Every structure is written in structure tokens, then in C-alpha cells.
Amino acid sequence: MEQFDGFEYSKRDLLGHGAFAIVYRGRYVDRTDVPVAIKAIAKKNISKSKNLLTKEIKILKELSSLKHENLVGLLKCTETPTHVYLVMEFCNGGDLADYLQQKTTLNEDTIQHFVVQIAHALEAINKKGIVHRDLKPQNILLCNNSRTQNPHFTDIVIKLADFGFARFLNDGVMAATLCGSPMYMAPEVIMSMQYDAKADLWSIGTILFQCLTGKAPFVAQTPPQLKAYYEKTRELRPNIPEWCSPNLRDLLLRLLKRNAKDRISFEDFFNHPFLTSPLLPSPSKRILESARSPLLANRRIITPQSSLPVPKRAGSTKLDSPTPVRRIGESPRVQRRVITPGMPSPVPGAPMQESTDFTFLPPRQESSPVKQVQVHTNVSPSLTTCKPVPVPSQRLTYQKMEERLAAARKTAVPSSSSPTGSAVSAQHQHQHQQQQEPASSPVVQRIERPDQLPRRTTLQDPNAHDIERMTMPNPTFVVCGSSTKPSPNNANRVRRSTITSPADTQDMVAADQMLSNLDPTTTTTTIPKSATTANIQGIPRGARDRSVTSPPQPTIHENEPLDNAKYQQTDVNNSPTAPTEPFIIKNQTTCSTSSTSSSVVEEEEAMSLPFASGSHLAAGFKKTPAEVPMDHGALPPALDQEIVLGEEHKQILAKLRFVAELVDTLIHVAEQKDNPLASAMASRRQLLTTGTSTTNTSSPYRRAEQLVVYVRALHMLSSALLLAQTNVANRVLHPSVAVQQVLNQLNDKYHQCLVRSQELASLGLPGQDPAMAVISAERIMYRHAIELCQAAALDELFGNPQLCSQRYQTAYMMLHTLAEQVNCDQDKTVLTRYKVAVEKRLRILERQGFVAAVNT
């Protein structure tokens, strides 16, 4: 502990430092519970600045005599042979810069509370003829009187500090010294013109603008560029958001005047209505943006069924306004618009003005992405529900099921008011729609008529290529089943389970009659789940999203039970004994056989491998022999519909599955960017491995990174859905169960990314920040792929090859995508070389049985 004149401090308790001094947290020697701030100034550093130090001490003593609540008080000044110590009161809340770093932006209640106190402090020093000349968030200290970790803003007291650049100005005297921080300097100061105390008013306006929007009103990469901007711009107009209240808008415009003579006077500033009048309710930022955005004003926002309402960002007070805010994530997924021939097209609204990083364009006239493959019932638009389209080969079966259910509900409500009763087959509706419906009634949207489907707004991305022109990686790699628990990075990357259906009506009826005789160890046939499906709440969310790929079903009312328990998949976990024979998945394969232990054998896709055409079997996979006896009355395996379809159909389906897998990875990357701890850890890893860290962990920067990733995902999804629509219209892609499932997944992911992008855009981005210019989706994808390879290499090094398979597979997929999309031949060569290196590692893992290669 260093001691002097009744005070002590430790050099480890550093609070901050400046050009001439270091500030420590100290205390009284005889009162150790009373903290103080000790500014230690080494005499060797002030040999040429003694006058500056003397002036600061004089100003601090002058202001301390006022004992003003909003000015940092000087407790004692002590000189030793080596140092000059200024002992000042300690502020336990940090400074405004730290507060803004945590909160990003402040609501107007908080801004008003802070600016009133700043005005009181400024009024006090102005009466003494003092101009601060270095007002910035770092010199505005906060005192937390509540002693709580997260105090309410009304418990925070503002104190002005650091009068090192302050000076006395007599009436009418102008200064011409260049000092202060360039971003907060008044134009007359940075242009080396004479200035007076009104320079502090400009700094106050800049600080208020930053509190409101999270960025400075005028930004340049260097001080000379900012100076040049001020010199050539005669009329400075800050871009104040529309949701700003009139009083605050007026105050900002009057503070941020280029000419000091036109700037608001101190008297008018101290008595401005924003400081003296209670705040009037102002429109929410999100409501105003919703009103002018064509996507929010003229469309129903549809959230994925599995997504939760968008939470409020941690640490942000922007949404704390008492005015009601319309949450984007609250609209139910089943709300869809029924298109009628007489309905006018929505008029496009004004484009988003605050965020220029991307623009939502109107639908293209020549083509549009396909809507989710579902029929729309002929009920009112507000009560529209979605029904799955039956597989063409199963329409007769589906119709018989509906007739049997209708006969069992003779005493129930009429089918016209029942969601289930209205879900007749697409074929049945097509036969009777002209006789039953007038020309002006809503028409049923069928997959055979893609031109009638509602059009989705398309996101254009000049850096990304269309999915149609993308080639599939050859080979693709599939991670084999393992009893090892997946790592957190791969928690949401569980492979899809096999979804099959009976081949014909006889199989379906037989399944109903023989349900009680089926052996749970050999039953694998499933169809899309209904309300009677077994509870899956215990399954992790990521596993649920990937393992159940059936299209989402509408809610079934209690008075309309469906007799489809026979289509449920028997849970292997509930089997009293594990099978002793190889676990059989119909016409499919496994990487291992089940043992007599209680471990669960994970299903693998062979005929419907992700990204594979479905006609090839992986090496080491074992196809179910046709002559295997079906014990315990089990049904013979049904023929997979994808086998009999054309090769082009299989290739397109494989490409759609590849996009779904890739978008899952992009969403995972974007969610990682939302976690400040994960970003800080990534920056730390980069510092340890390369010696330098280029990762920016600020909240606006992370939001910008999330936004570009979500926009890239939106483009890929839009392109994939457009590809599907075109090929469905040309009868190349058939509406099979697998196609419906993957299109439903793509549709859900599209709405999830769209809602999240709009949420991020509504928070605002510092568009003039030069750090934002280097953000790109390709850079983020490349960095993530390299990090996956590094983590996988460490897993191999420490003898955990079972953990690295998924990481290598994901990196292989992302490197292939980047190599397909880049335009630079040199970049493509580097990416291809890295991809080949990862492929070699996967080949080694293939020989060890951890992955299986499939030629596409």
C-alpha cells in the first residue's frame, strides 16, 4: 500500500489513467470504509505542464468551495518529492461511457434525468467563468446512491470531473487552444477558430445525441476528416430519429449548430422545456418503423411455431417506455392471408430509413419464392388455418380417413365451423369448389397452381449466388450414431429422423388392426404427429426441431379426437429389453448394431441421407434384407416414395436439405453473436492463437454481424424456395412427404430469420462507423469454419475423435458453400485447399467408423 498524508492506496486498484495522471481507488488511513479517488501525477511527466496542473488545482479548489452536488469535489492536494496527489470524492457508478456501453441507448426519461444534472453543473461553472472544454462521457461520473448493482436511473447522481483542460474565461474573451476529444469538439474548436463557453454546449448536444441513438451525430474516420467535413458543410443537420419527442428534437437542433452565434444560449438551455417540463408520451420507435415499413404495415408477420417471443435485449432500456409496444414475435404462426380474386394488392410503404444495410424489395414480377406447401381453407382470413396436402398416392386413403372420422362425429358441430372438418383432401375440394363457392369467395390455393400463391418479398444479395447454380459437395459426410453426448456447439445439429408412411390403403388399415401386436423393437413406421403424439417436452429444443420434420399441424379441439394413434412411433426408451438383433430401419442402414445394454440406438438416414439423392448407400451401411422374417406380426417394410421418383427430383430435394442444414448453422452463428460472453471468449481465443485480436465486442457491432448473417440466410432460403416453386410448377419436383417436410422447415426458418432481422434493424445501427464497413457474411462464415476446424483438431489431439466429427462436417459444408460463392479465383483456390484438407480428416474419421461418406 502506498501512503501519504493520511491516505493510502494500492496500485492494483486502478480506476483510470490519462495523458498526465493515473487515478487509483484509495481510502483514509484511519477510516478504511470511506473510499476516495486519488489522482497521482508524477512530477517527471509534468515538467512542461506545470501551468496546466496549477490551473486545474485552482479550478478544483474554486469549484469545491461551492460544494455542488453535480461537481466532483477536491478533498485535498498533497505534494511529495515524486508526485502530486489530488484526493477527490469517489464515484461508485463508473462513468457515462461505461453506462452507455452497457445500455447502448437510453430512453428519454433517463436522458432528461441526466441532462438536468449536467445543466446544473454547467450553470455552476459558467457562473464562475469557467469553460470545461473536454466534456465527454468519460468525464461524466455516476454515483449510485441506492447501493444496488443495477440501480434505477433516478438513483444515479451525475458529477462532472476532469478539469485538466478547463480554463477561466473573462466576459468577451475568446480562446483558441485546440484541446479536448475530437468527436465531442465543437466545430469552432476543431477548426482552430476562436471559441467561448458555448463550445461546451456543442459537447452536451453530442453526448445527448449519443445517449439517444447510440452514436455521435457526425462521425469521421480521423479528426482531419471530421475537420474537413465541418469546413465544407455550412448547414449541419443531425439525423434525429422520428421517434424522438418534439422537445428533445428542438433541444438537439439548437445545441448542434455549426455557428456558435446560432447556438442556443446558456439561459435558454437552462430553461428549455425538455429540462423543465414533464415528458409527453411519444410514439414508440418500433411502432413508427412498423407504420412505414411495407413488411410490417401491409403483411402479417408469421413467426415459426417453435420460436418464442423475441426477448428484450439485455441491458437495453430502449423498450422500457411506458407506452405500449407491439411485439413482433406475438403473431401466431397460423395467421395467413387468404387471397381472393377481388382483393387489391397491398400498396408498398416507405422503405426503412434508419438501417441502410439492407432493403426489403417488392416481389419480382417474373418469379417469386414458393409459399409453404399447404392448402388454405375457405374460412374467414382472420381464422385461416393450414392443412397439409396429402401425398398424391395417398389421397384416396386420406379421403377414407376423413369419411370414417366424419361418421364418428355425427353429433359434433358442423364441419364448416370445425378446423378438422374443413380439412378435406385437396382432390375433393378441387372437384367441388366451382359448385360450392361463388366467384368472389376465397379460392383454395393448390400446389398445382403456384402462380396463385401469396408472394413473399425477396431479399437480394449481390454477394450470394442462387441455390440453383450451386453444386452439391461430393462426397457428403454423415456423422454416425454415437452414445457420446453432443457438444454444446452441436446441440442444435441433431440429424433428422426417418419419416415414412404406409405405401397403400391396405397397409394403413392393417396397421390399425394390428397395433396391439407390434413389437416395439421392430416398429419404425411413422407419419406426421398429431395431438395424440406422446409427450416430447423432455427432448432438447434443438433435437425437437431436427428430429421431427413433419409439417406443423393445426390445433385439434378436444371435441374432435383423431383416431391416429396407430401412426405413432414407438419409443425405444420404453422398451423393457433392448433388441439383440441389428436395429432395423426399413430399407435403411445403421453404422452399428445394438447391444444388450439399455443404450438407445440412434437412427441414421440411408435412403434419405441429408443432401444425398437417396439412391446410394454409405460404405459400411447394412441394408435390410428382404428375406428377414417379420416376427411378432410386424408389417413388411413399406416402399419409400422417394425411391420411385426421378433423379432430378432427388437432386433438388437433396439441395433443399443442404440449404436447411446450412441455414441451421447460420442461425446458430448469429445466436452466438448475441451472446457477449461468447464474443469475448472468441476474441480471447484469437488473441491467444494469433497474438492480435480484431474482434469487436461492442453491442452495435455484434448486432451488425447478426444482421448480415440473418440477411444471408434469408437470401439462401428465398432462393431455395424459389427453386422449389419453379420445379413444382414444371412437375420436376413432386409434392411428396419429404418435400413438404423440408419446405415447411425452410418456411419456418425464413420467418424466424425475417422476424429476427426486423428486430435487429429496429434497434438501429451506427451506419457511419468505419468498423461496420468490414462486416460481411462471408468473413463471419469463414471465421466460424476455421474456429470449428481448430476445435476439432484439439479434440483429435486429446483423443476425442467422436467429438470432432460434427465440427469437421459443418466446416466442410461451410467451406464448400464459400468456395461456390466467392468471385475471386485466389480466394476460391484457398477455400478449396482448406476444404480438401478437412475432407482428408473426415476420410480418416470414416475409416475409424465415426462418419460415413456418401457420393451425390
UniProtKB/Swiss-Prot annotation:
The lineage of its organism: Eukaryota, Metazoa, Ecdysozoa, Nematoda, Chromadorea. It is an enzyme of class 2 (transferase). Residues 304-327, 362-391, 405-471, 520-582 are annotated as: Disordered. Changing residue 39 to M: In KSEX9; variable effects. Changing residue 360 to A: Impairs the interaction with lgg-1. ATP binds at residues 15-23, 39. Disruption phenotype: Worms exhibit various abnormalities in axonal elongation and axonal structures. RNAi-mediated knockdown causes abnormalities in constitutive dauer formation in daf-2 e1370 mutant including a lack of autophagosome formation. It comes from Caenorhabditis elegans. Residues 411-436 have a biased composition (Low complexity). GO terms for biological process: apoptotic cell clearance; autophagosome assembly; autophagy; axon extension; axon guidance; axonogenesis; cell migration; dauer larval development. The gene is unc-51. GO terms for molecular function: ATP binding; metal ion binding; protein serine kinase activity; protein serine/threonine kinase activity. Residues 9-275 form the Protein kinase domain. Keywords: ATP-binding, Developmental protein, Differentiation, Kinase, Magnesium, Metal-binding, Neurogenesis, Nucleotide-binding, Serine/threonine-protein kinase, Transferase. The LIR motif (LC3-interacting region) is required for its interaction with lgg-1. It catalyses: L-seryl-[protein] + ATP = O-phospho-L-seryl-[protein] + ADP + H(+); L-threonyl-[protein] + ATP = O-phospho-L-threonyl-[protein] + ADP + H(+). A motif (LIR) lies at residues 358-361. Protein kinase important for axonal elongation and axonal guidance. Functions in the CAN axons to direct both anterior and posterior migrations. Phosphorylates both unc-14 and vab-8. Component of the unc-51/atg-13 complex that is probably recruited by lgg-1 to preautophagosomes and is required for autophagosome formation. Interaction with autophagy related proteins such as atg-13 links it to the autophagy machinery to in turn promote P-granule degradation in somatic cells. Plays a role in mitophagy during limited food availability. Regulates cell size. Residues 365-385, 527-536, 566-578 have a biased composition (Polar residues). Interacts with unc-14 and vab-8. Interacts (via C-terminus) with atg-13. Interacts (via the LIR motif) with lgg-1; the interaction is direct. Pfam families: ATG1-like_MIT1, ATG1-like_MIT2, Pkinase. This is Serine/threonine-protein kinase unc-51. Its EC number is 2.7.11.1.
